[in-house]
Regions:
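Small-residue (GG/TT-enriched) beta-loop-alpha framework at ligand/catalytic clefts
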Residues: 13-15, 56-150
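Short hydrophobic segments within beta-strands
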Residues: 22, 105, 157-158
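Generic domain-boundary/flexible-linker signal
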Residues: 30-32, 125, 166
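Surface loops and adjacent helix of pleckstrin homology
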Residues: 33, 117, 183
Length: 210
């Protein structure tokens, strides 16, 4: 239980000045700055699939805003001073660290998050549930077709993926340039000494989120 972990875990239970959490939610939309009305957020409710509280995150350098809502059960389990972000925020924060056209894929144990940059602009971002390599292959083919990707586009990988697993082998069927994307900025965590650095790229990217 998440709430119990925050109360009892030796690391999580400490008194922090600030806590950041990137949380998966299917209730999110992107709104360009010119169409965004901070004073009238209720107008976006019909696009959200939820009538719960709407959170907003402005991406200064990107020119748009993320609007999202969370499951009430999740909100209740987080410490009061938690600053919440949608799962897309760490990838958006890392977009400035990529040069040229690129596909960035962030893996968890049962899902993956995709960001595509073309002509120095974010043109695509989405999140997919994939329980196995077969499901991953299905969604990957959809993405390739939708974005018109070629085998030469650079693909940067982070999260729970390794060179010897089926997900990596699946990517090799369609792309020639695969790279592990390592954490941006300072890295003082002891975790990085014991695990592959790219496992924590998305987590540490939260430090870049405003």
């Amino acid at each position: 239980d998440l709430k119990f972990a925050f109360e009892t875990d030796a690391h999580l239970a400490q008194s922090y000045g600030a806590i950041k959490a990137a949380i998966h939610t299917s209730n999110f939309i992107f709104i360009p700055d010119e169409w965004f009305d901070q004073e009238n957020l209720s107008v976006y409710t019909k696009f959200m699939g939820s009538e719960r509280k709407i959170y907003t995150k402005h991406h200064d350098e990107l020119g748009f805003n993320t609007l999202f809502s969370l499951d009430e059960k999740v909100e209740e389990k987080l410490p009061e001073n938690t600053v919440v972000y949608p799962q897309s925020s760490p990838l958006l924060a890392l977009s400035g660290h990529l040069s040229g056209d690129a596909l960035l894929v962030d893996f968890t144990a049962t899902s993956f998050n995709v960001l595509f940059i073309k002509d120095k602009k974010i043109t695509f971002q989405n999140h997919y549930e994939a329980e196995n390599a077969e499901e991953f292959n299905y969604f990957l083919l959809l993405i390739i077709e939708q974005l018109g990707l070629t085998e030469s586009v650079p693909v940067y990988l982070q999260g729970i993926i390794n060179e010897d697993d089926e997900y990596y082998s699946t990517l090799l069927k369609y792309f020639n340039n695969l790279y592990f994307f390592f954490p941006a900025g300072k890295q003082n965590s002891e975790l990085l000494a014991d695990m592959p650095k790219h496992y924590f790229s998305g987590l540490l990217a939260l430090d870049l989120c405003e």
